[in-house]
Curated annotation (Swiss-Prot):
A GO CC term attached to the entry: nucleus
Biased composition annotated in UniProt, kind: Low complexity: 153-175
Name the UniProt record assigns to this protein: Protein ATC1/LIC4
Record has Phosphoprotein as a keyword: yes
Function (record text): Involved in cation homeostasis and in the regulation of the cation stress signaling cascades. Also involved in bipolar budding.
One annotated GO biological process: bipolar cellular bud site selection
Compartments (UniProt record): Cytoplasm; Nucleus
Record carries keyword Phosphoprotein: yes
Annotated organism of origin: Saccharomyces cerevisiae (strain ATCC 204508 / S288c) (Baker's yeast)
Keywords tagged on the record: Cytoplasm, Nucleus, Phosphoprotein
Biased composition (Basic and acidic residues): 130-145
Highest taxon of the lineage: Eukaryota
Length: 294
C-alpha cells in the first residue's frame, strides 16, 4: 500500500508498470464503489465504465466547481446564456480525459494473467485501508490525483478513442472529436432558436377579441338572429304539422269513399247476375212459345 501511494513517478517505459499505474489511478478515482463486492476484470460492463468515467469528469471540472462556489442557480435561461461563454478547450480537455480513462479500462479488461490479479488485489486492499478516509472526505475526488493521472496517461502515447469508436457498430476515429463538438453546438443553437421563436410568438400575441365591446355586440346580434331563426323553424314545424293532420283527414275520407265504392260495386255485381238470370229465363219462355205456335 505504501509503495503504491509513495511511487507516483513510476518508470513508464515498462508496460507492466504503466498498466499498474493506470489501474491504481482508476481505482483511486472510483473510490465510491462498494469494497465488499469482488471485482472481475472480465465481467465489467462497458456502459457502466463509460457512465462512471463521464460522472468523474463532470465532478472534477472547474466549471461546475465555480458554479457551486458562486451558488449559481441552474435554470434553463442560465444554461442557454452561458453556452457561448463555455471555452472549447475545456470541453476538449474533458473529452481527452474521458478517452484516456476508457483506454485504461480497456487495457485492464483485456489483460490476463498474474499481473491483472495482483493489481486487483492491491486495489481492493488499498480501498479497504482507506475506507475511513473516504467517509471523512464524503467521497470527493482529489484534484491533484486527477492531474497526475492525466499527466501519466498522456506520456503513454496511446491513440485517443472516442466513446463512439468503442461501440461495435461505429467506425469513427479519434479525429472526429471536433466534428461531434460542432454538431453539439449546432443542435444547441437550433434549440435556442426554437425557444426564441416561441417567446416571440407569445409576446406578439394581441389581446383576445372576446374581451372587446365589438365582440359582445356581435354576439348579441348573432343571438337575436338565432332566436328569430328558431321562431321561424317552430312556425314552419307547426305549419307542417297542421298540413300533415289535414292530409291524414283527407286520406281517411278517401279511404271511406273507396270502401263505399267497393260496397256499391259489389251490389252492382249481384244485380248484374240477377239480370242475367232473368234474361235467360225470358229467352227460354220465348223459344217455347214460338215452338208451340209452329
Amino acid at each position: 500500500m505504501n509503495t503504491n501511494q509513495s511511487n507516483p513517478n513510476t518508470d513508464l517505459t515498462d508496460d507492466a508498470n504503466i498498466e499498474h499505474t493506470l489501474h491504481r489511478l482508476l481505482t483511486q478515482a472510483n473510490n465510491h464503489f462498494d469494497d465488499t463486492v469482488k471485482i472481475d476484470g472480465q465481467s465489467l460492463d462497458l456502459g457502466k465504465d463509460l457512465e462512471q468515467v463521464m460522472m468523474d469528469n463532470l465532478d472534477c471540472t472547474d466549471i461546475f466547481d465555480s458554479d457551486i462556489a458562486s451558488q449559481k442557480h441552474l435554470t434553463l435561461e442560465s444554461l442557454f446564456n452561458d453556452e457561448h461563454n463555455t471555452d472549447s478547450s475545456t470541453l476538449l480537455e474533458m473529452q481527452r480525459s474521458a478517452n484516456d480513462s476508457l483506454v485504461g479500462i480497456d487495457l485492464d479488461r483485456h489483460k490476463k494473467g498474474y499481473t491483472g490479479k495482483a493489481s486487483l488485489d492491491k486495489s481492493t486492499n488499498q480501498n479497504n485501508v482507506h475506507k475511513p478516509d473516504k467517509e471523512q472526505k464524503n467521497y470527493k475526488i482529489d484534484k491533484p490525483t486527477i492531474k497526475k493521472k492525466k499527466s501519466l496517461l498522456k506520456t503513454t502515447n496511446e491513440p485517443m478513442l472516442s466513446p463512439a469508436s468503442l461501440s461495435p457498430s461505429s467506425s469513427l476515429a479519434s479525429s472526429d472529436a471536433n466534428e461531434s463538438h460542432l454538431k453539439i453546438e449546432s443542435m444547441i443553437t437550433d434549440i435556442t432558436s426554437k425557444i426564441d421563436s416561441a417567446r416571440q410568438d407569445i409576446v406578439s400575441a394581441t389581446k383576445p377579441a372576446k374581451f372587446t365591446n365589438e365582440f359582445t355586440i356581435s354576439q348579441i346580434s348573432e343571438m337575436k338572429a338565432r332566436i328569430i331563426n328558431t321562431h321561424k323553424l317552430l312556425l314552419n314545424f307547426n305549419f307542417i304539422k297542421e298540413g300533415y293532420a289535414r292530409s291524414c283527414i283527407q286520406l281517411k275520407k278517401s279511404m271511406d269513399s273507396l270502401k263505399d265504392s267497393e260496397i256499391h260495386r259489389a251490389h252492382l255485381l249481384v244485380e248484374n247476375d240477377d239480370l242475367k238470370q232473368q234474361i235467360l229465363e225470358l229467352t227460354q219462355k220465348l223459344n217455347e212459345k214460338s215452338s208451340k205456335e209452329s
